From Swiss-Prot:
Subcellular location: Secreted; Target cell membrane
UniProt entry keywords in alphabetical sequence: Amidation, Amphibian defense peptide, Antibiotic, Antimicrobial, Immunity, Innate immunity, Membrane, Secreted, Target cell membrane, Target membrane
Signal peptide as annotated in the record: none
Highest taxon in the source lineage: Eukaryota
Family, similarity comment: Belongs to the frog skin active peptide (FSAP) family. Alyteserin-1 subfamily.
Keyword field contains Flavoprotein: no
Main location group: secreted
Native source organism of the sequence: Alytes obstetricans
GO CC terms of this entry: extracellular region; membrane; other organism cell membrane
UniProt name for this protein: Alyteserin-1b
């Protein structure tokens, strides 16, 4: 559903930010 898509997108965004901060 839409919530799953939103959660997946949010998780991806958080991972991207975390990776950016770690570097």
């Amino acid at each position: 559903g839409l919530k799953e898509i939103f959660k997946a997108g949010l998780g991806s965004l958080v991972k991207g930010i975390a990776a950016h901060v770690a570097n």
